[in-house]
Amino acid sequence: MKKHAKVYYSENLVEQVNEFETSFEIKPLERGLGNTLGNALRRTVLSSIPSCAVFGVKIEGIKHEFTVLDDVIEDVVTILNNLKRVRFFYNPSVFSQNSIHVASFLGQKAGQIYARDIESHSGLKIVNPDLYIADVSKVGALKFELFITNGKGFVDFETNKKYVNEVISLLESQIEGSVLAVDSDFSPVLNANYQAVEINSASPIIEEKLNFSIKTDGSIFAKDALSQGAKILIAHLNLLADVENLNKFSADFFGDQEIKEEPIRRFSNSIDALDLSVRSLNALRRAQYYKISDIEKLSQDDFENIKNLGRKSVQEIMEKLQNYKNENKGEN
């Protein structure tokens, strides 16, 4: 009987941009399995990873999207398009008791309004706080509420319009106006690609490795997205593995995967947290330095001996490393 080689999985840290955009390597695989696994994983992570998104927006005094707002530069359609792009960190436990949550901006400031000015009533965290919403010339001229739910994939505004009509009596609000449905893009994965490469073409037994790259919107780590995609595939395949007992399997296979509440803390020891220039970051990675703990004991001479690090880059690293230490003195 043919023996199968042990398969290894690793993250390609040299090509890592940050923990939300990176690539992975899986090898050795039997010939043909690279494309089989890669295609299945790619389709799954792009379409089936659960998340949350805005499905409805209420703007004070607005009954339809073609109404004009005084003292606001943008029209209602533009504001709606901006608001539906606000992304929240998804925690399934938050939505287990209540499937609809509210976030709002109640006109407490004038000037340029960003996603960071929006307050979540349920403690949901906004992962793109620098997203521009609108420019307001008068305090109180713009007030709005976002209604958020969980789901998968893409839901168009026509479908959400029906959903709004179904749940309208459940939507608690502090302002007057109509709830306007918007498109909902629940997928936290922005991009996923794969490549199957032969790794021993000189051998009579041809094997492959799978290179899989993935980029998320910041609401989930790339590694977690890949893990969830694999678990979803395994759950479906497990149903087929025991054909004698298909009707005995529980639907729990397809429940939401629990996500850690504080993803940014896992980011804290990565050199990405120093916010270095691309040149400095790449030079450190090529020298096999990936964590702050790896470089904090290096001297200036040690840094200058690292290939492709000039004086300005060394100075930048040392200054930002010192700033990082000062900011995190009390967190040990």
UniProtKB/Swiss-Prot annotation:
EC number in record: 2.7.7.6
Cross-referenced SUPFAM superfamilies: C-terminal domain of RNA polymerase alpha subunit (SSF47789), Insert subdomain of RNA polymerase alpha subunit (SSF56553), RBP11-like subunits of RNA polymerase (SSF55257)
One example of a Gene Ontology biological process annotation: DNA-templated transcription
Top-level enzyme category: transferase
Catalysed transformations (reactions): RNA(n) + a ribonucleoside 5'-triphosphate = RNA(n+1) + diphosphate
One GO CC annotation: DNA-directed RNA polymerase complex
Ranges where the record places region Alpha C-terminal domain (alpha-CTD): 259-332
Pfam families linked to this entry: RNA_pol_A_bac (PF01000), RNA_pol_A_CTD (PF03118), RNA_pol_L (PF01193)
Region (Alpha N-terminal domain (alpha-NTD)): 1-244
Gene Ontology MF annotations: DNA binding; DNA-directed RNA polymerase activity; protein dimerization activity
Keywords: DNA-directed RNA polymerase, Nucleotidyltransferase, Transcription, Transferase
Record-linked SMART domains: RPOLD (SM00662)
Keyword Transcription listed: yes
Listed InterPro entries: DNA-dir_RNA_pol_insert, DNA-dir_RNA_pol_RpoA/D/Rpb3, DNA-dir_RpoA, RBP11-like, RNAP_asu_C, RNApol_insert_sf
Entry function: DNA-dependent RNA polymerase catalyzes the transcription of DNA into RNA using the four ribonucleoside triphosphates as substrates.
Subunit composition and interactions: Homodimer. The RNAP catalytic core consists of 2 alpha, 1 beta, 1 beta' and 1 omega subunit. When a sigma factor is associated with the core the holoenzyme is formed, which can initiate transcription.
Entry text on domains: The N-terminal domain is essential for RNAP assembly and basal transcription, whereas the C-terminal domain is involved in interaction with transcriptional regulators and with upstream promoter elements.
Family of this protein: Belongs to the RNA polymerase alpha chain family.
Entry protein name: DNA-directed RNA polymerase subunit alpha
Gene that produces this protein: rpoA
